[in-house]
């Protein structure tokens, strides 16, 4: 993980590896990998984002681990805050953000409860526009989350899900190809290897023949 720089813009080649941060971005207790881009209007709290991943703007991400090469479209929400629906007489956040209303100290135990519902997103995941990943879910490597999907359950590797609540509608590859890709762990290749093999990434058959 590296320090962040601002604003979000194309940098000189020697600075490509530095995370690029847009305007009106709040980062609290978070870590960003190399080549990460965070576009405008985002709140990211207690989250780790892996190398080469990006957000497209207007995003909220809380208490999450995001893998490498993850594509996060506009208006995606990851781990929106649960309210105490069953535990308390009132659902309103005055019961745990009490200081904002002059009603005493905040309830730190409640925020610890939220942290326990961590979200994990694997590598090379594509999360479509306006999708929501609910607290506690895990999304496997290579998965696709459709536009406006609400993910309430774990999503398997290379699965394609869509809908409210999200359901599996297909797979990107067959089991054999998935196993070969997983074995390669290409997302862990160093930058020079990625650069050298970039043309091969653009053709699945060529890539599979050479590296899988």
Regions found by a protein language model. Name each.
Residues 112, 117, 185-199:
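Leloir-type glycosyltransferase catalytic cores
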Residues 133-143, 149-152:
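Beta-rich strand-turn-strand
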Residues 164-173, 178:
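Short, charge-rich, low-complexity interaction segments located
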């Amino acid at each position: 993980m590296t320090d962040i720089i601002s604003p979000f813009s194309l940098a000189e080649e020697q600075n490509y590896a530095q995370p690029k941060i847009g305007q009106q971005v709040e980062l609290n207790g978070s870590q960003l990998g190399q080549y990460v881009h965070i576009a405008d209007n985002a709140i990211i709290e207690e989250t780790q984002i892996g190398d080469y991943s990006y957000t497209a703007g207007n995003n909220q991400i809380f208490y999450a681990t995001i893998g490498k090469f993850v594509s996060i479209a506009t208006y995606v929400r990851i781990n929106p805050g649960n309210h105490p629906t069953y535990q308390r007489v009132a659902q309103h956040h005055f019961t745990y953000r009490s200081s904002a209303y002059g009603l005493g100290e905040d309830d730190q135990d409640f925020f610890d409860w939220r942290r326990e519902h961590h979200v994990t997103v694997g590598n090379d995941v594509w999360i479509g526009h306006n999708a929501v990943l609910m607290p506690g879910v895990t999304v496997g490597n290579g998965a696709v989350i459709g536009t406006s999907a609400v993910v309430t359950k774990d999503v398997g590797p290379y699965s394609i899900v869509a809908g409210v609540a999200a359901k599996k509608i297909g797979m990107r590859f067959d089991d054999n190809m998935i196993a070969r890709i997983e074995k390669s762990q290409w997302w862990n290749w160093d930058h020079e290897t990625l650069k050298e093999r970039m043309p091969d990434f653009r053709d699945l058959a060529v890539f599979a023949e050479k590296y899988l």
